[in-house]
Amino acid sequence: HLTNIGAGKRYGKISEEIKQRLDFELEVIANTGYPGYFLIVQDLIAAARDLGVSVGPGRGSAAGSVVAYCLGITSLDPIKYNLLFERFLNPDRVSMPDIDIDFDDEGRGKVLDYVIKKYGTDQVAQIITYGKMAAKSSIRDTGRVLDLSLGETDRIAKLVPNMKLNSIFQMKNDEMKQNLRGEEYSNVKQLKEVYSSNDLAGETLKQAEILEGSLRNTGTHACGVIITPDDIREFVPITVAKDSDLYVTQYDNSVVEQAGLLKIDFLGLKTLTVKLIKYNHKIDLDPNQFPLDDQKTFNLFQRGETVGIFQYESLGMRRYLKDLKPNVFDDLIAMNALYRPGPLEYIPSFISRKNGTEEIRYDLPEMEEFLKETYGITVYQEQVMLLSQKLAGFSKGDADLLRKAMGKKIFDLLEKLKPKFIEGGAKNNHSPDILGKIWKDWEAFASYAFNKSHSTCYAWIGYQTAYLKAHYPAEYMAAVLSNNMNDIKQVSFFMEECRRMGINVLGPDVNESFYKFAVNESGAIRFGMGAIKGVGKTAVETIIENRKDENYETIFDLVKKVDLRLANKKTFENLAYAGGFDSFKSSHRAQYFYIDSEGTPFIERVLRFGSKFQENKKSSQMNLFGEQSDNVYQVLKLPDCSEFGNLERLKNEKEVVGIYISAHPLDDFKKE
């Protein structure tokens, strides 16, 4: 019923092809016992949209299902892109279907609450993850237990390259010379010397080697949620999450699936851009409605300006995009599938064929129908499945077996299917020699072939992010910076991209900044106050809340208004160091740290003044004229001292943010 209503909305007129496909899918879903699964997912997504949570386009093999498309679970038409349902669920293969749904980061909690409310706390659990001891943490833990000094433990742990301890200590000298370069080589040499000594440090390394890889702690799977038809304790062992009252399974992801439980992946999609656009431009955007022929977006791909674009941001990919000059969505799907170890070697030929410098050839004219979009190169498993049906009359189940045999390199199965393919093709009047060549090509290509449903979904998410970057560059980059706020290397990398794009990134400012990076009225990006060390979310909230009616004029104005229980001395000091008060024209950064004759920094005196002012206001000790009876304000004057020098100012910025914001120490030495 729901599928038919959805089909009417999605397609308008239902053609015979669509009707047959829907009947086939619904029959398989009913026979494999999964109608409930589809209904739960459909209900979740509808509820999320009602709650104002943005939902991604759906990823993975589920994109091959027309039923999922009609129910609003996925947002790409599988018939238009030749995506196959058998890739997701087929009558001969009864493995659990797995639908990955993206909810935006902030909305995920809301959806989880909805699931618990609907199905009850005793039928919903998150999935446990087991954290293992890695090389460095096993050294640190062992050092702590054996009482090796903290400094020495840290020094040894920092020598470990990105390798297992066991591999390091078994490595022979000539292997070391061959595989390790420069600093890594000398570090490993030192490690081996410590290992072979009989002192406490040597003992620490020997014990750490034994402990490496053992389970250290448990966490919660960021995305997975289990829903059971009855009390969850009847199905799996459970425990309670560390940071909430929610149940968590004691089985991890792989076991849960084998136990045949209903697993739904919640994956947080970054939808901050859309929120920023709404805030700045008062436009409500739905990325699932973006047109797939937008010239501005394709121009961005053609210039290779895809830094910060999902799946298309690596250096190699950007180079290939410039050569390929993609101008249709199919090109993006193919590049996503080809840009991986293995099929990478096909990219130059793919580019030449697209640009007309290499001839497009088909072994049989019938192959053009399915290989045209990839210029005669077999890129997807789906193409092999469709061609085996068309050329040799394979059933849908056989075609999926062939895919499985190729993808997993099951050579016995391939041997079994080959005669079936040659004979079936011969019945359709195709030359056995040509069929043999096609089969040989497929075998060579088999291990590379990619799932087109995956590629299409990834390309669609990549396209949506590129569309936003092309049309709303400042908002998009502000969102990218916010998503990487905790990784300062990434922040400076993306700030460089902003400079290339001609977007100004301004330092933090208590009158303009939010917790995350945002775009101001003049189209520049403002640093997020949350990126400053020691400045917490609640402190930022009270600063934002109290400037709604008017901006803060001075530091005194600020401490009179904000809740000083939430914004403490550390918050104020680090804001000052980062330049958060630079918009107060009457003062400069050094004044806040001026120490008076009693040894008190000025910022501390300002905070005392603020507390006193707020106390007095509370106890409403006002005189007749409504003025503050306590005259503290007049006593505090900005100290007279010289400003920080350029280098000191920058050193302070780097200390509290991790990067230089207002300039760079070497700017003075730039060539004119």
Cite the ranges covered by each PLM segment.
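Noncatalytic, beta-rich nucleic-acid-contacting surfaces in large DNA/RNA-processing enzymes
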Residues: 1-672
